[in-house]
């Protein structure tokens, strides 16, 4: 009698890597739509540019490695990396920002370590941190939500600002940002931290135009949209609940502790949950199966650590949002976390 010999794993999921990546992209659509609605066409332009550059880089690297570029592109991992970076940067950033970021993400953070499944760090977050440290002005040049601007940038103006540096009136992005009276161009997290450091109370800070009833205008709905997409991923079992729930719990827990011991010195848990890249990070970034912890207990520790670090960086760090730094710090700790949380082998 003949038996087939195959290497592990012997229990396989019916979903391929490409299926998982396509579902991630589909569930990220609500967040993309919300970002485009509140912050303009720049997000869509950045996304199309990022996908084009990522596909070209992925194909080029695979050819250099003497492997099939078609098979690599079919798993959609490069598209997911491009998507995450495109929605993380300011919509009207210069075109070369996303190009440089994707070179670091695809070439260095992914293929330098061996390609898909071998990278110890999240490629999109590596790219984001490199860009933020190297080009802080371009990476923090966020426009106010469309709702707060009298003349939002049109599709043509957005295209001109990204690829030419000036709009149809000859104004640069920085000139446009400083030309809007009475509205700070800082994100809600940055505005909140700056206002508190200036000695203003929390109630005074929340009266600024970019804040609405419970968080920053636009940002709250963007986070709710990513939360909706993340819940769909959970329902479909594309991701597991441990990391996103632990991350949100870590963020809320540390924010509540700060409110308890130093009231009025930090933002409330609600503002932290619905500002910045909280939901995008919890459901679409931290859950990266390659760079995240692999045990159930480890995922809880990993997620909680990210949430706590996000709060610490947001409150006392030098950058307004801390999701990217928190994820990369947690990626560094994954081998240690997995070592001490690996399940006991039966019989030992």
Swiss-Prot record:
Which sequence positions carry the modification called FMN phosphoryl threonine?
Answer: 187
Membrane-crossing residues?
Answer: 23-43, 44-64, 72-91, 126-146, 214-234, 243-263, 266-286, 300-320, 321-341
* KW Signal (keyword) present: no
Q: What is its main location?
A: membrane
What is the residue range of the signal peptide feature?
none
Name the needed cofactors.
FMN
The name on file for this protein is Ion-translocating oxidoreductase complex subunit D
- Organism of provenance: Vibrio cholerae serotype O1 (strain ATCC 39315 / El Tor Inaba N16961)
């Amino acid at each position: 009698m003949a038996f087939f010999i195959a290497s592990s794993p012997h229990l396989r999921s019916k979903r391929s890597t490409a299926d998982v990546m396509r579902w991630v992209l589909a569930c990220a659509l609500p967040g993309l739509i919300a970002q485009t609605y509140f912050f303009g066409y720049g997000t869509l332009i950045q996304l199309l540019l990022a996908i084009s550059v990522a596909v070209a880089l992925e194909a080029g690297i695979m050819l250099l490695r003497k492997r099939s570029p078609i098979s690599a592109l079919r798993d959609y991992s490069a598209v997911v990396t491009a998507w995450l970076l495109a929605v993380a940067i300011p919509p009207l950033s210069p075109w070369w920002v996303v190009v440089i970021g994707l070179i670091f993400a695809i070439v260095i953070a992914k293929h330098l370590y061996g390609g898909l499944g071998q990278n110890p760090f999240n490629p999109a977050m590596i790219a984001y941190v490199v860009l933020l440290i190297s080009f802080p002005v371009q990476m923090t040049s966020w426009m106010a939500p469309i709702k707060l601007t009298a003349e939002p940038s049109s599709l043509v103006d957005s295209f001109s600002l990204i690829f030419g540096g000036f709009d149809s009136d000859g104004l640069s992005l920085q000139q446009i940002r400083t030309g809007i009276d009475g509205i700070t161009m800082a994100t809600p997290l940055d505005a909140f931290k700056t206002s508190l450091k200036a000695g203003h109370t929390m109630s005074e800070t929340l009266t600024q135009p970019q804040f609405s009833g419970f968080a920053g205008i636009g940002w709250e709905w963007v986070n709710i949209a990513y939360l909706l997409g993340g819940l769909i991923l959970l329902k479909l079992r594309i991701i597991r609940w441990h990391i996103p729930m632990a991350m949100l719990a870590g963020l809320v827990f540390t924010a509540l502790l700060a409110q308890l011991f130093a009231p009025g010195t930090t933002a409330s848990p609600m503002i932290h949950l619905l500002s910045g890249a909280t939901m995008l990070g919890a459901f679409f970034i931290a859950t990266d199966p390659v760079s995240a912890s692999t045990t159930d207990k480890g995922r809880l520790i990993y997620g909680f650590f990210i949430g706590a670090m996000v709060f610490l960086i947001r409150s006392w760090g030098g950058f307004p949002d801390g999701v990217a730094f928190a994820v990369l710090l947690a990626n560094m700790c994954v081998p240690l976390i997995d070592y001490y949380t690996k399940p006991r082998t039966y019989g030992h």
